[in-house]
Amino acid sequence: MGGCVGAQHDSSGSLNENSEGTGVALGRNQPLKKEKPKWKSDYPMTDGQLRSKRDEFWDTAPAFEGRKEIWDALKAAAHAFESNDHELAQAIIDGANITLPHGALTECYDELGNRYQLPVYCLAPPINMIEEKSDIETLDIPEPPPNSGYESQLRLRLSTGKDLKLVVRSTDTVYHMKRRLHAAEGVEPASQRWFFSGRPLTDKMRLEELKIPKDYVVQVIMSQPLQNPTPVEN
């Protein structure tokens, strides 16, 4: 993501091939284009899911090769670009000496020749965005009949790093499993986002329909701290 490609600037502002580099011709630096990328997500995405995906990228990007100050500048430029403040985005890019061979933030280089690539989801929302479910809609989910289905243990990995096994029933919806997790860990259902094989699970999906393999770990992203922490003894 931030690997050095062995390129250098010349006096005209272009990027030339380095005789000892990879032989990749990067082309002339271009001003940032105003057109936003249009893309479609693999699954309909809510605003909250998009924010989480972006946060995950910006939290991990500086861990790759490249300079943190450049990542910070690119994050600020991406925010300005999406907010239609094109002049500010260009000023940030120029101030950090960032080169755009194609006039897009999807491929950038710093003055040392390090390459930085921003995913399109950091620059614009997908064309298949959907609205967040409201609390009123959630109330429409019917309760499963008592003791219906069969009982099993579902392995969860929380965003806090904690692993646990949650006792669930095959007729449970994702929302009811969120309520079970709320009872066990104190995290409100609205603050939980469940993912199976990278796919977000909606509240109305039933466990028996998901066909989650035994011992498969379901990821749970939580947007609030755990409630009622265990007191520390003196």
UniProtKB/Swiss-Prot annotation:
Domain Ubiquitin-like: start-end pairs: 152-227
Membrane spanning stretches: none
Annotated protein name in UniProt: Ubiquitin domain-containing protein 2
InterPro entries noted in UniProt: DC-UbP/UBTD2_N, DC-UbP/UBTD2_N_sf, Ubiquitin-like_dom, Ubiquitin-like_domsf, UBTD1/2
Organism: Bos taurus
Biased composition (Polar residues): 9-21
Main subcellular localisation: cytoplasm
GO cellular component: cytoplasm
Bias (Basic and acidic residues) ranges: 32-41
Keyword flag rRNA-binding: no
Database matches in CDD domains: Ubl_UBTD2 (cd17121)
Superkingdom of source: Eukaryota
Pfam families attached to this UniProt entry: UBD, ubiquitin
Compartmental location: Cytoplasm
Keyword Heme recorded: no
Residues covered by region (Disordered): 1-46
Keywords: Cytoplasm
PANTHER family, per database record: UBIQUITIN DOMAIN CONTAINING 1 PROTEIN-RELATED
